[in-house]
A protein has these predicted regions:
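A short acidic-Thr-Gly-centered motif at the start of a beta-strand
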Residues: 3-16, 216-223
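Hydrophobic (often cysteine-bearing) scaffold residues that line and stabilize catalytic clefts
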Residues: 4, 19, 60-64, 80, ...
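Mobile genetic element proteins and their domesticated derivatives, centered on retroelements
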Residues: 7, 21, 41, 56, ...
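Amphipathic alpha-helical blocks
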Residues: 8-44, 115-117, 160-184, 233-235
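A short, polar/acidic, helix/strand-boundary loop motif
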Residues: 45-63, 248-266
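Active-site palm subdomain of RNA-directed nucleic acid polymerases
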Residues: 61-99, 174, 178
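C-terminal reverse transcriptase regions that engage the nucleic-acid substrate
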Residues: 78, 83, 118-225
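Acidic, metal-ligating active-site segments
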Residues: 234-250
Length: 266
């Protein structure tokens, strides 16, 4: 399967987006007659088997991905990105949207792939894709994930800290020097006894919440575009960020835009 981060980067910073949903997903792929018996299941009315690919098969996702990439081969990485049954048509200029749609629909029709119109969205400036928000601004965190973190109660035990750490991990690429800000929180994960929530730990969490509430935005690099790597290291934490410099109208010097943050507690 493709890397999710590559799909997200490629879909961001476009003027218009169309999100497509295939009708019944995997069931649009027919099973080979010789393999149908392997999908047999028992019901009160006797045994039945699938004649189309069911959900749950080990290679179902990869098989569906292969079908979509074959169908949209000439558009993948150009005007279309696809991750299994999540497809997005990306248009740099609104004027070419209809042409991009016409080409995509023609390719889907060639392979008899049907879409669910109730779940398709056309010509929008932003939308949710694979757990992120992509728009012409760049890549933003899913607001639902941010709300989940902001609404967590003050941790009272190890289980609560583990839940908090999980929420932060899902948003880590948006948080500068996360390891330093959350160091005291991570240390609580190592303790099995004498759990104590301190003011210093609360201050670190407040700093993270404030940063996320500001709606940070990442951008995706273009092929061949130079990037800068900044590293900050202490004896406890190593943090880094990939940055791209781009010229912006009205500014004398190029602006630095973050691509991805990483942080590791030693």
């Amino acid at each position: 399967l493709p890397r999710i981060d590559q799909i997200i980067n490629a879909a961001a910073e476009h003027d218009s987006l169309c999100f497509l949903d295939a009708y019944s997903g995997y069931h649009q792929i027919k099973m080979a007659e010789s393999d149908q018996a392997a999908t047999t299941f028992i019901t009160p009315y006797g045994p039945f088997c699938f004649n189309t690919m069911p959900f749950g098969l080990k290679n179902a996702g990869a098989t569906y991905q292969h079908m979509i990439q074959t169908c949209l081969e000439k558009q993948i990485s150009k005007t279309v990105e696809a991750y299994v049954d999540d497809m997005v048509i990306k248009t740099r200029h609104v004027e070419t949207l209809i042409d991009d749609l016409r080409l995509t629909f023609g390719n889907l029709r060639t392979y008899d792939i049907k879409l669910n119109p109730e779940k398709c969205i056309f010509g929008v400036p932003s939308g949710k894709l694979l757990g992120f928000i992509v728009s012409n601004r760049g890549i933003e965190a899913n607001p639902a994930k941010i709300r989940a973190l902001l609404q967590l109660d003050i941790p009272a035990d190890l289980k609560h800290i583990q839940k908090l750490a999980g929420c932060m991990a899902a948003l880590s690429c948006f948080i500068s020097r996360l390891g330093e800000k959350a160091l005291l929180l991570y240390r609580l994960l190592w303790r099995t006894e004498h759990f104590v929530w301190t003011d210093a730990a609360a201050a670190g969490l407040d700093e993270i919440n404030t940063l996320l509430a500001s709606n940070p935005v990442l951008i995706g690099p273009n092929i061949g575009e130079p990037m800068l790597l900044y590293i900050a290291a202490t004896h406890q934490v190593v943090s880094a960020v990939l940055v791209i410099e781009r010229e912006v109208d009205g500014y004398k010097f190029p602006l630095q835009n973050p691509v991805y943050y990483v942080s590791t507690v030693l």
